[in-house]
């Protein structure tokens, strides 16, 4: 039965594979460690740091264990969404090992029968099994706490103190209450002395604190003790209440009944019948009582006490079952103990079905991947609700797609130009006008439902019904005729003033797939400076449409656009395919600006020559203007070529700036394509 706990947790994971915003830091951290590796500047936490910093130690350990599986997936070209299963199963495996250690301690103290009941009760409850695969700070602390409790039951106080220190200083500072109470009990029972405590606690505490400060300061780029900042924010400043408050006794009348299910009624019976369990259970309940002082409450905050209470319930079941032959009443009670497990299973199935409707964002992006399978150059914007309810970097499985979680999105016409698809909150009273405007340009492919409420149905075998409502809409931009597109661009140009660093006179760049290890990519990174064929990549010919809005504005040649400096590392990261979607777009925008600026500098002479030619040659001058427009269209191809080059093979970057090197490359490509005006 030992493997059952892991298998049950895995079943919960398969049914609910997505995650919520509370899990995002650890999940994104594991993704970045596994896929971005030493490209630390592109890690997700730099763009989305969260309210308080969290430790990287948990994600780092899980990622190290998961790395061989992820490398195998990459070798077999298995998309990285399956790697999310791997890291979460590794976390569940760690908890299973720790839980098994606790189970062995229970066997040694209370007997084999209690162990069997303990296992049966645990796997039939919902919340403990469900949270085993959730990458939350509390869950990273859970296996260490289970080891600590097991050591405490065995009176092995040195490893108990070390495990307590790790869980408190690295993961969850509030565990000082629970594990501190257990330590006080040991001191009062004289199972450990103060001298012995200090000899272990002081050096262990210093080493543990130094480890978390060293590791996390490196990843966060500042001197940092993450759990110290969390403690200050939640406890001293009491700002955790910004995320909601609950009544003082909420843990007792809401969290514990839901987590324990029918087993809760057996806990006091177990405490009454088994004196040896009382110190542990009372310590756990005292921890819950003290922790109730903080107004912000969540069930996962007290998940560490569930196994302790289950031991008490198992003791009750064992005593009742052992006496089942004494009388009819005892037989009935024994039958009730077995039946309560079946009731737990029904509660678990009901809660699991509800839980499956709580991740509309993940379901929406997964559905979009199926709907648009085989479609390239997709740019999808992920709304805030979608990002908080299931979307993670593990779901960015298509290298030809652009995934954006831009929080400044206002859904204006200018904002929507960049996107082909939207995951947007479904229509409600607050966003009626938004949906009215979106339906002018986008078609609704599907709606993804999420949990709404629980209803009662009297004319059905199942009296309880789970009600859902549309939460996320999947939208796709309608194809636009060239003339309409031209009018739209003119309208946008009149109504919106672009920031200087985003200003452009050209159509948006099409995204091309970037695959690390692609032979074509490698050949591009190894070109020589005098090899025109190497510099000029073979790209698919783009259709060239002469649009009325491609002509520069009057006086444009006199304006020198200020640029954010582009550096070699940005280009190198882009060429190797290691850049994030956000940084890749920013780097390409800088390349585009340099090309436009360089062309404007050359374009003055071209325009003057063209004007003189038109006076003398008429139609020949007109053909020259057409060539100039075609040249502007070719810039889109040029950006893609530059994005795959290794500039160290072309320029001496110790003597030449990156910007000047890019200008040399532009001229080289320009010459090879025959685009220069003659």
UniProtKB/Swiss-Prot annotation:
It is an enzyme of class 2 (transferase). Pathway: Protein modification; protein glycosylation. It is found in: Endoplasmic reticulum membrane. Pfam families: Glyco_transf_22. Its EC number is 2.4.1.260. InterPro entries: GPI_mannosylTrfase (IPR005599). GO terms for cellular component: endoplasmic reticulum membrane. Mannosyltransferase that operates in the biosynthetic pathway of dolichol-linked oligosaccharides, the glycan precursors employed in protein asparagine (N)-glycosylation. The assembly of dolichol-linked oligosaccharides begins on the cytosolic side of the endoplasmic reticulum membrane and finishes in its lumen. The sequential addition of sugars to dolichol pyrophosphate produces dolichol-linked oligosaccharides containing fourteen sugars, including two GlcNAcs, nine mannoses and three glucoses. This is Dol-P-Man:Man(7)GlcNAc(2)-PP-Dol alpha-1,6-mannosyltransferase. The gene is Alg12.
